[in-house]
A protein has these predicted regions:
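Extracellular/periplasmic catalytic domains that process cell-envelope and extracellular macromolecules
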Residues: 51, 69, 91-95, 141
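Solvent-exposed loop/turn segments at secondary-structure junctions
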Residues: 63-65, 82-84, 105-109
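Short periplasmic/luminal acceptor-recognition loop of GT-C membrane glycosyltransferases, typified by
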Residues: 31-75, 99
Length: 157
């Protein structure tokens, strides 16, 4: 893996092959990249503290894989590989989804399923959710996160 094309995978070298006496530029780069997931770990910890039921948070794994990997309860998340992902994303309030975890619709974020379904989600909540938490990312080349609480469905009579 090359740091310009697959930075997360490149950084795994620091985790999978630790070598504290290696002071090469490559090892330093691996360590810098591996540290980039501190923000994602904090988001996972925050969501864990909410004691959410399974399938409560929708996110895409384009960037969200670090959060899932850090979560002690990955079943809290609905991700694109889940068979009901599209159904839940299309109507989150009717399907018990409580949060949408969004990244900016720029760079790799343009391919994020939430941004494709709700192009204004990151900026406005797309009329389906309300901004609850904004998390600036201190990681190398990683996006800032926004956690949106899904709006309750309005019942008309």
């Amino acid at each position: 893996a090359q740091p310009d094309y697959a930075p997360q995978e490149y950084g795994l070298g620091a985790v999978l092959k630790p070598d504290p006496y290696n002071v090469t530029v490559r090892k330093a780069t691996e360590h810098r990249i591996a540290r980039t997931f501190g923000t994602e770990r904090k988001i996972a910890e925050y969501l864990q503290s909410l004691n959410l039921p399974d399938s409560s948070v929708i996110t895409d794994t384009v960037y969200g894989f670090g959060i899932l990997a850090a979560s002690p309860r990955p079943r809290v998340f609905v991700i694109p590989s889940d068979p009901d992902f599209t159904e839940l994303l299309n109507d989150p309030s009717a399907n018990g989804i409580r949060y949408l975890l969004a990244v900016p619709p720029i760079g790799r974020g343009t391919s994020d399923a939430l941004n494709l379904r709700y192009p204004t989600l990151y900026n406005t909540g797309a009329d389906v959710a309300t901004l609850e938490l904004e998390v600036p990312n201190d990681g190398d080349g990683q996006p800032d996160w926004r956690l949106y609480r899904v709006n309750e469905r309005v019942v008309t009579r």
